[in-house]
């Protein structure tokens, strides 16, 4: 059985909506492949940050057992939220022992503006994954692909979404997030099959 983690921070739940859509995509792909896929979805909470440091050793142990980790954060001031950065900094022991090496990684972000430098957040998430020796998965859809207009912003590195005034996501952003979940789950399945032979 494969295990895919979705680790994110969300203040207004816009990024949380993306996380749930990604989880739905992972689940749909698992059903399609008639294989079981465990999903570990963890929203970073303020109570886990003590004197500026993220503290949750149990989560770090669980992440070491995952086949893929999908990272998410809203874009604040052109980068990840401080809460996510606290989590990233706390992963240094996992980095030192390369516990996440060769795992699949992907990322997602949201912002209040059409382009509030969300690509900088994705680039940070990519660099973070590369530091851990992970394999980054982006989107393989050009902008406005298919009936659902997947990847409406044309960002290949991961999911970028803009929350509406009502706090809801555009339908194509939800569909794109589901697609990324399916894509990561399919790749994990292929890699598992390859390593089993």
Protein language model annotation of sequence segments:
Residues 104-151:
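Short, glycine-/small-residue-rich phosphate/pyrophosphate-handling segment
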Residues 86-88, 125, 153-154:
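Short, surface-exposed, charged loop/turn segments at secondary-structure junctions
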Residues 123, 155, 171:
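Glycine-rich phosphate-binding loop at the start of an alpha helix
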Residues 96, 135, 146-165:
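Glycine-rich, flexible loop/turn motifs
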Residues 1-99, 159-197:
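N-terminal beta1-alpha1-beta2 submodule of the flavodoxin-like/Rossmannoid cofactor-binding fold
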Residues 40-47, 141-151, 155:
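Short connector loops at secondary-structure junctions
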């Amino acid at each position: 059985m494969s295990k895919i983690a979705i680790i994110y921070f969300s203040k207004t739940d816009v990024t949380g909506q993306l996380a749930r859509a990604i989880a739905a995509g992972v689940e749909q792909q698992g059903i399609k492949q008639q294989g079981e896929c465990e999903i570990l979805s963890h929203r970073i909470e303020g109570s886990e940050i003590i004197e500026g440091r993220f503290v949750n050793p149990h989560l770090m142990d669980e992440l070491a057992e995952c086949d893929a980790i999908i990272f998410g954060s809203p874009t604040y001031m052109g980068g990840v939220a401080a809460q996510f950065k606290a989590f990233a900094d706390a992963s240094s022991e996992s980095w030192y022992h390369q516990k996440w090496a060769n795992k699949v990684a992907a990322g997602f972000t949201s912002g209040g503006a059409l382009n509030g430098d969300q690509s900088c957040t994705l680039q940070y998430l990519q660099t973070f994954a590369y530091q851990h020796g992970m394999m980054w998965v982006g989107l393989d859809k050009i902008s406005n692909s298919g009936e659902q207009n997947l990847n409406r912003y044309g960002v290949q590195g991961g999911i970028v979404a803009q929350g509406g005034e009502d706090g809801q996501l555009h339908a194509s952003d939800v569909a794109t997030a589901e697609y990324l979940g399916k894509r990561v789950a399919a790749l994990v399945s292929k890699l598992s099959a390859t390593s089993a032979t």
